Amino acid sequence: DEKLRKLGIIEVLRKGVKHFDKTVDLFFHQPSSNYNTKDLDKYNANIFSVTQELVYSSDNANRLDLTLFLNGLPIITCELKNPLSGQTVHNGIRQYQNDRDPKEKIFSFARCMVHFAADTELVFMSTHLNHKKTFFLPFNKGLNEGKPVSPFGAGNPVNPQGLKTHYLWEEILTKHSLSNIIYK
């Protein structure tokens, strides 16, 4: 807990924690080749898990829609909204600003890598929750994925196979991608 407060989750995962004269590794990065089977086995032993509706406080019954863990440590929180049920990504942002107290351990600065608010169209992210002052950045691909062809603009391209925000699940929140983000 002390190391997480001082260094943040990314640094603790990268460097481990010292206990007396030993370092306890909490994460193993993907080795640069598959020839080192010992390191590959360690990397494959990392446990990425997801909890839906995580009750994060002993003071109330508030829940997070989705929380991602690495080897038991929370690394990402998500508020997921569905415009068909009347809520958009902006409701998720307001939920973080109004209902998620940064005094709670999971929301304190650098305790998690990132907090996402997402719906079927858009994704926004913040790394520092601070009530109404919390600033969210767009985490979208842009129209035409940034290629110099019209139409230009914010948002996400149409996905013929499903949701416009599919890239978050299929490209970012994968074991390989998250491991690279943490390691680098």
Predicted regions and their residues:
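ATP-dependent helicase/translocase motor core
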Residues: 1-184
